[in-house]
Every structure is written in C-alpha cells, then in structure tokens.
Amino acid sequence: MQELYNPSEIEALVQKHWQEHKTFEVTEDESKEKFYCLSMFPYPSGRLHMGHVRNYTIGDVVARYQRLQGKNVLQPIGWDSFGLPAENAAINNKTSPAPWTYENIDYMKNQLKLLGFGYDWSREIATCTPEYYRWEQWFFTKLYEKGMVYKKTSSVNWCPNDETVLANEQVQDGCCWRCDTPVIQKEIPQWFIKITDYAEELLNDIDTLDGWPEQVKAMQRNWIGRSEGIEMTFKVKDSEQSFDIYTTRPDTLMGVTYVAIAAGHPLAEQAASTNPALAAFIEECKNADTTEAAMASMEKKGVATGLEAVHPISGKLVPIWVANFVLMNYGTGAVMSVPAHDQRDYEFAKAYGLEMQAVIKPADSEVDISKEAYTEKGVLFNSGTAFPELDGLEFQAAFDAIDARLTAEGKGKRQVNYRLRDWGVSRQRYWGAPIPMVTLADGTVMPTPEDQLPVILPEDVVMDGIQSPIKADKAWAETTVDGKPAFRETDTFDTFMESSWYYARYCSPHADEMLDPAKANYWLPVDQYIGGIEHACMHLLYFRFFHKLLRDAGLVNSNEPAKRLLTQGMVLADAYYYTNDKGARVWVSPLEAEVVEKDDKGRVVKAVDSQGNELVYTGMSKMSKSKNNGIDPQTMVEKYGADTVRLFMMFASPPELTLEWQESGVEGAHRFIKRLWKLASDHVAAGPTEALDVSKLSSSQKALRRELHKTIAKVSDDIGRRQMFNTAVAAVMELMNHLSKAPQDSAQDRALLAEALSAVTRLLYPIIPHMSFTLWHELGNSNNIEDSRWPDVDEAALVEDSKLIVVQVNGKVRAKITVAADATKEAVEQLGLDDEHVQKHLEGLTVRKVIYVPGKLLSLVAN
C-alpha cells in the first residue's frame, strides 16, 4: 500500500474498474428486495454546479448504503434536455439547439463520472430524443381519446421576450422567471390536460405520503386548494341574463352590497360596448400581472358597468362593477362583495363610496366596521325580512339554511371547488416535443394516427429569435391523414411533460412501448426521490398526477410515484463586488477575493481583488452566475479529489438546510481522508493480524470496541433512517480520534484496529467510495466492497462493565467515580461518600438530600 494518498490516481483506477465491470448496471431480480433511488435529473446547461453535486451526492450515498444492505439497487440518470436555455443559446449563436444540447450532455456526463456517482448508464435517457418523446406523444393521444385533453382559448401569462406562455408559478414579481421581462396577459388557444379531474385524489393521497416533508405536503394541499361553498345564480335586472357566483362564506350573503366581475366576463364586454371608460379599463386589466403576489399587493380598482344584479334571496338590486381583483379563469369570474365582512371588498367600497351592511357580529358584543371589516365567523343578525330565521345562527347552521333555501328555489347548490386549474401544456416555442394533434381541411381536430408517431422535431434548423422554425416552416406543418390534407399542431409540450414520467421510463428505457409493465411494477414506486423544494407545486404535483394517469392506463399498479422525498437545501457562497467607474456593480469570484481584515466576530471588514479593487462583502448567498460566486466542482475535484468534495458536501450541513461553501472546510475534509489513509497504511505495513478474541480484551480495549459498535449503530441510523449524513460523518470522525490514539502494542490491539478499519471503510463507502474501494482491498479483502455487507452491530460489545458517575456537592462537580454497570443506588451513594474529594467538601456539613440519575449523576445537597 502506497504511503501517500493520491486521489487523482486512485479515483481514475476505481472509476475505470466500475466502468469495465458495469458495476452499477442492474436487472430485475425477484429474489432480492429492490431499492429505486432517484435524484431529479439535470438540465444540460453546460457545466455542473455545486447544487447538482449536493443533490447527486446525497442520492449516491443513499444508493450505496442500500446496496450494502443487500438490496437490488437502481440508480439511473438522464437529461431533461428540452427547454428555453438551449433555444436562447442557439439564437445567440445563430445555430440549432440540438448540437448545443448534445455537447453539454457529453461534457456533464464526464463530470458526473469524475465525481464517482454509481449510475446505471445503460438506462440513460435524454428527453429531446424521439425515442423518448414518441411515447409521451402516444400517451397524449390516448388521454385525448379518454376525454382527458381539450383545447380552448384562454387568457395566459405571456412573456413577450421569450414569446411563450408561463404558468402562474413561473411568474415572479410580475416578471418571467427566466428573463425578468414584465409579463402581459394574452388570449390564445392552447391544449389542457384535466388535472382537476384528479384534484380530490391528489389531495386525499397526500395523507399517504408518510415519507415526504410536511412542508411539501402543506404546499401541495394549499395549491390544490379544496373549498366547500355554495354556487348561486344572480339575475341581471331587466334582462333574461344571469350569472353564477361561488362563495365559501354564504353566511354573509345578506350583506352583499355590490357584485364584482372580471374584465373578461361576458357582461363586462357587453357593457363596455357603450362605455368607453369601461372598455379602456378592461384593456388595462388584460395586461395586468395576475399572479397571487401581484394581486395581493396591487391597488384595487374598478369601473361600474351600469348594470344591476338581483339578490337571490332578498330581491334587492346591487350594482355590478368590473374589478381588477377578479379573474375570469378563477372560479366563475364573478364574486359577491360583502364589504362589512371582507377586507378587500371593504377597501374597494371605501374607495368608491359603496354601501356597507353588517350581518355578522361577535357572539358577545356589537360589531364595529368603522375602521376595518369584521371577517370572523360570528353570529348572524340584521338578515332582513326576506330571511329573518337566519338571525342568531352561527356559521354552519347559516350555511345549511341558506343552502336548503337556494336549492329548494333552484337558485343555488352546495359545491366543492378547487384552486387547482387544469394543466396548460402548450408552449409556443420550438425546442420541445411537438404536440401530436392535426387539423383537417374541414376544421376537424384529431390526434396524429399512431402509425405516424413520433412526430419528429426537425433538429437541423437555424434559430433567428423571431419565430419558431416549425411555425415558420409551412412545409413541416403540412401532412396527410388517410390521404386527406392536414396541418400539424405547431405548439410544443411544456417541458414539465417530459419530467413528469421520466422516472418510469428508466424502468424499461429501451422498450418498444411506453413502459414494460412487469419491469415498471418491479421497480416502482421510487423508494427515495431527491430534489429541491422549489419543485413542490409544479414538478412534484405533475409527477404525482402523471403516475395516476399511468396507473389508470394499466401501465403501473401503485398509487404514488415515490415513497420518500428528501428536499436538499441550496449551496451558498461568499459574494463580493466593487463599483466600476460607470457606477455598475462588478461581481468578483470569492476565489479571487483576498480578505484583508475581519472584525472580532470573524466578519469580513475589508477585502480586495487581484487588481487592487476594494470589495464590498455582501455575505453568503446562493451560488449564481449573476453574482459570480459559483465554485466550479471540477476545479475542486482536480485540487482535492472527488471523495473530498463529496465528504465536505455531506459533512458541512444537514441535507435539508442550506450549505455554506467554505474552502477551509474542504481542506478539513481532505485532511481527515489523509489521516484515515495514513492510519490504514501504517496498519497494513505492520503485517498480518491475528483473529480478534473478544474474551481476551482488556477493559480499555473493550471500551474502544464499544465506541466502534456505538458508531456503527449511529451511522446506520443516521444514514438509513434519519438521513442526517452530517452527524454520521461526525460520528466516524470522533471514532477516528479514538483509533488514532489507541496503542498498537499487542496482537489484540492490532486485531481490534483491523476490525475497526474494516467497519470504517464500509461506513464511509457511500460517501467516499473511491478511497473505500481501495482500502477494502489493501486491508486484505478478496471481494469488491460493493459486494460486501454493511457492518453489523455486536450488541454484546455495547454492554458496559462499568459507568463513570459525576458526583456533585451543592451543585458543583467535586469528583468522578467508576462503578459497576449494575451497581445499586445505595452502592453508588456509598462510593461517592467515600471519595476523598467529596469528603473534603462535606467536612462540617450534613447531607440532607441525595439525588441519583442512574448511570450518570450523584448529587449531594448538604449544609
């Protein structure tokens, strides 16, 4: 065994071995328990960042741990390779997205291999290949045939820069999440999948996700947004027209003083035809930001239509207003407004001088709406002559009474509604899977026939940044169906389509069908899924929805796609900038910043770059290109080795919290690995060891062996159950301190160290696999570490012969005594009283009280 640790040499040899022996390729094996470990696949942007490294290291640690448990472990990888960044890069370079994407895949694949991740590369997929999206297209046509797909014109969030539709979740502070362009509203026809048909099941099944973080589950419950209310009909005065309103607070119905409708409501458009001010306001609303954050903070504005609605119970006439806070694509596009009991309605009524009528009050006092609305569920009063029986009722009784009356009169009904909207899957971009629908000359819309699938996206195109090549190329859109001319759909799928079922395709990536059900049902559901919490309400919801679609198509037999979910935190790094002569901030890499001065709390006071510019330190922030504070993983691997980078990633922070990148921490991880190498090297150099005989161990040897097996127990629990990888590493480091100080004088000393090194090598194998692979062989094992088993805890070794008891006199520690592990309270008390240090502090005092905490503490109170 070479004396010095050489990571580049070791890692290259081990990676070559894994590749040549196809170590991580697996097939279905009914005789073994399976374990499917999956990290969210990357977008091939060009280079891995530290966020990728953290995600994939966590996944690899879990997968390797489960392999040593004897399980048949699948850990695949692939590429989420459609999307806007490739298009934008192609536009900038006047080329096609395809070569840019495939070059990035090749580069990043090599980076993943350098980090030693144990992937089954035989299952690699790229979502931009026809072999993949063919089956997505096929499945979409089947959903269409089942009535799960429809096309309609709708108001959408539109990014003028990227020329594409954005989901509400993709609009941040009124701007596009990708390019920060202000978002406008636009009416376009697009395709939808009826996720709302599964809203109830998606909501109820959240309760079965025992292995998912509570935060993710809460976010999904809120996003699905189930509510129970009443949908009622309001008639328009002097008209045959009527419109529906849904409310979850029917108890406030008798306090309605106006009705607000969306700018896109048919009544609004009708009224605008003779009202120029209203028409202008409607145009203003169409271009407004409709995200929740914007709606919550924007000024509430409206214009009266001149129309009046008839209250469904009292018959009272109330004005109809168009308001910017009502959306046509949410609910019915109309809301009953009760300013006395809704703060938004209150502010609007105050602004426009509208009537307020209180009809709910606290049970034990009068209601005051002089300064704000009373929004609690109190007791009804002031209900009027049309329904005086409501007075005195509380919320649920009032709900039931109003429901009964409206139902009996045919004016309303109880209803469950969801905040969740159907999934708009159309995108007006090129680099995506073509939507497999055609339109015949007579206007008939139909799925592309199965024998014409896949509808292949042409890759040999040039992006001009003005129009999608498949929209510009009329010849591409022209096709025939049964000899009749037809035109292809030129929209492409939302890329969330590809990422919603990739996990299932890994089970049979080369099958000439969407899924091989036998293989899919062997591997699914995923046992461990790993990815960022930012995906909670988009990918992770679509992921669950798609699995239920696959189930109902008979392709899988489980209800949920993943048993356990770990959401890793972000990676942060120091951020520095200076202001140039034009007043612009220039961000400087932390690798180029020299800290000149720190305050007494260790905070940076002064720093400069290599050019002498004095830098402003802004603290730790998420690694990003915009702040130039990303650390290239490849640079760190070349400097310290992959195992060191992996160890730091696992040790620096609990997995679900943010990780602060500190190169000093990386150096510390590197020193630890070198210490372990040196300990093993010295042990091997001393020659073979004899068998360990636990019956001959001294008390100190027993104590060391106890520490070893306590560590095995803790690391097993930390990795396998708690997933607290940082504390697992800390436990091994603490054990290493004991091993480094242990004498190596006798044969049993060396035999004990041999047992410890064998265990430590396997305990660390999931985290530092290259070194562990090498040490395993150097320690004399003939098999490969991947084929070994996780170390077992020797329960007998954990039994202590004696205990160290702390003795206090009047709250101060005065002695530490060693007692038999099974010593009685009386025996411990006597030993404590007999101790010379204790006697010294009891001189002249009488012991009044004795407190004994078994195995830990003896406390004497004396005066």
Curated annotation (Swiss-Prot):
Swiss-Prot/TrEMBL GO biological process terms: leucyl-tRNA aminoacylation
Keyword Nucleotide-binding among UniProt keywords: yes
EC number(s) reported in the record: 6.1.1.4
Similarity field: Belongs to the class-I aminoacyl-tRNA synthetase family.
Catalytic activity: tRNA(Leu) + L-leucine + ATP = L-leucyl-tRNA(Leu) + AMP + diphosphate
GO molecular function annotation: aminoacyl-tRNA deacylase activity; ATP binding; leucine-tRNA ligase activity
Coiled-coil regions listed in the entry: none
Assigned keywords, A-Z: Aminoacyl-tRNA synthetase, ATP-binding, Cytoplasm, Ligase, Nucleotide-binding, Protein biosynthesis
Entry keyword annotation includes rRNA processing: no
Motif ('HIGH' region): 42-52
Residues the record lists as binding ATP: K625
Matching Gene3D superfamilies: 2.20.28.290, 3.10.20.590, HUPs, Isoleucyl-tRNA Synthetase, Domain 1
Protein name as annotated: Leucine--tRNA ligase
UniProt xrefs under Pfam families: Anticodon_1, tRNA-synt_1, tRNA-synt_1_2, tRNA-synt_1g
Motif 'KMSKS' region: chain residues: 622-626
Subcellular location: Cytoplasm
Alphabetized HAMAP family for the sequence: Leu_tRNA_synth_B
NCBIfam families noted in UniProt: leuS_bact
Source organism (scientific name): Shewanella denitrificans (strain OS217 / ATCC BAA-1090 / DSM 15013)
Alphabetical list of PROSITE patterns matching this protein: AA_TRNA_LIGASE_I
Primary location class: cytoplasm
GO CC annotations, alphabetized: cytosol
Uppermost EC category: ligase
